[in-house]
Amino acid sequence: MVGGGVKSAERETCMPGEAVLQLNQVSITGRSKRDSLFEQSLEARAHEILGIAGVSGNGQAALASLIAGLEVPENGSILIDGSTVEKPTPKKMIGAGVGRIPEDRNHEGIIGKMNLADNLIIEKLDDTEIQNFGILKQGKIKTSAADLCATYDVRGPGVDAEARLFSGGNIQKMILARVFEQNPKLILANQPTRGLDMGASAEVRRRLLDARKNGAAILLISEDLDEVLALSDRILVIHDGNLIPAETRDRAQIGLLMAGTAA
């Protein structure tokens, strides 16, 4: 999506820090080259939003799966804070400080028939704050969930209700609460405002910019070029499984890169 109009986000100037995420010559072979990555490298730094712009189906899913630990690279390496993540898994990536806002919030972001409170702690079940020798502290979990719902303005039938009963915007705010409360070093934001109304979209963007200000590295994957231009410090275009640096913020030139027709 190249048009559409995104309200300008207040993106303050930040000095980029050290590299948080490094991909070095990684490859994943999918069903076609549009589902793959071919010896690609990138670096995302603290206090920075790295935007990945592209038309749907050009390797975004492969890139997101790699960083989430859902795929193991066939070659190359993944580093978080300079340390190689061997045979990445979702648990390893979370442990390394990666927070994930998935593309499909309803199927990848929540367990629909699980209540909201339990969805909020699903990624930290080893934390002794919420469990003791494997027994969950339900009172603590519900109190924490109520506090997070107030902080992130999650509205709906309550923390004991199944997550699937909440609206899309409130599910996304619940996911934001789960991610940001862990103070991740790296945030994978994959189509974070897709399908949201203007108010919910603005809130998501504000939270991403706050995380950037506070030192996180953010990898923003979006098909909305307006969003990428508004939020990103640097932009890479993904096309046919290849990452191409955008040397300009000119919409027309980036659009040509997205279409694979740039000179």
Across the structure, where does each feature detected by a protein language model lie?
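Glycine-rich phosphate-binding loops of nucleotide-dependent enzymes
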Residues: 1-263
